[in-house]
């Protein structure tokens, strides 16, 4: 399917930066219109660095759109179940990539299905006991973990056969899990308890919580998480605004200032850049994190109200879902 692009040049806002910030002069933005909208209900996206493909679960359309970030071509995996709720149509809503497969969570039938990245062919599926929220691949154990906040639990799927996910365990938590990150070197998993204002650290191999950190995000709690593999810093977004930087023992050693309404964030390890989108004021904030956990603003770019999640490709290009308008904002930061 051919993509429709609307080009605009968005000036970076220098006023929002600290005086010593390395502010970009401009950011080029493209708007990729998605089929079946508007609206197109989007939440968790997934990027495969090997193929350069961006997987975009598009809930109400019954599609998982796939953007080739190298060529700009848009394709899709079709035929996903949808279901009507009181206020919207739900369907595929989350995705993660590992070992040549994308694993797609569907809120319509509580399933997780494997999609072969190369052929975009759907393979095996498994049904969960609760509606999936976030889906993430845990490389050290060859598993896919799924946050199921309604049951205050994590569902663990074995993908030793990557085409055939299999439910193998349930981890019950003290609250509803929200967001995720993985330390592949140390086999650690991180997730937040949104209703408890905490971040949990889990031993992926032992399948248990080994520590928890108090965050102080406030009544709306924490949302997205990212992890710096080199510095071992954990970045935790607060829904009320801002991203806190935690060291390995949970001390807050830095803070990235953002507008309110932040959800999923992302981290570009190769450039030590942290990305956070604020849905309340429609901005993307990019900051550079130092070895000590301190952060320095690089750019603040105007996006769109409601754009509260961001994912980044290997080149540093940011992708922000705009569900209301049925499009994906593509923002290239000039430095």
Kindly give the residue locations of the regions a language model identified.
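Positively charged n-region of N-terminal signal peptides that target proteins for export
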Residues: 1-4
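Hydrophobic h-region of N-terminal signal peptides that target proteins for export
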Residues: 8-16
């Amino acid at each position: 399917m051919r993509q429709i692009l609307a080009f605009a040049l968005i000036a970076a806002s220098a006023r929002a930066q600290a005086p010593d910030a390395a502010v970009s002069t401009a950011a080029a933005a493209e708007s990729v219109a998605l089929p079946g909208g508007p609206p197109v209900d989007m939440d968790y996206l997934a990027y495969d660095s090997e193929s350069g493909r961006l997987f975009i679960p598009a809930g109400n359309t019954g599609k998982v759109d796939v953007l080739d970030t190298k060529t700009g071509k848009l394709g899709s995996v079709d035929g996903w179940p949808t279901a009507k709720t009181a206020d919207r149509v739900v369907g595929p809503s989350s995705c993660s990539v590992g070992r040549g497969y994308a694993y797609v969570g569907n809120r319509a039938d509580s399933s997780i299905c494997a999609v072969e990245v190369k052929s975009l062919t759907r393979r095996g599926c498994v049904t969960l006991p609760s509606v999936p929220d976030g889906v993430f691949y845990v490389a050290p154990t060859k598993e896919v973990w799924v946050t199921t906040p309604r049951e205050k639990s994590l569902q663990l799927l074995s993908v030793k056969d990557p085409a055939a996910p299999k439910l193998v365990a349930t981890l019950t938590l003290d609250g509803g899990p929200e967001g995720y990150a993985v330390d592949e070197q140390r086999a650690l998993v991180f997730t937040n308890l949104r209703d408890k204002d905490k971040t949990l650290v889990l031993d992926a191999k032992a399948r248990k919580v080994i520590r928890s950190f108090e965050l102080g995000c406030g009544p709306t709690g924490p949302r997205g998480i990212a992890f710096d593999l080199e510095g071992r810093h954990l970045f935790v977004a607060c829904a009320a605004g801002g991203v806190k930087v935690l060291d390995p023992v949970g001390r807050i050693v830095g803070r990235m200032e953002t507008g309110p309404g932040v959800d999923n964030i992302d981290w570009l390890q190769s450039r030590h850049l942290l990305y956070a989108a604020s849905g309340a004021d429609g901005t993307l904030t990019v900051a550079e994190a130092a070895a000590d956990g301190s952060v320095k603003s690089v750019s603040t770019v105007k996006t769109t109200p409601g754009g509260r999640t961001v994912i980044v490709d290997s080149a540093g290009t940011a992708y922000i879902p705009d569900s209301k308008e049925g499009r994906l904002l593509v923002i290239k930061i000039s430095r």
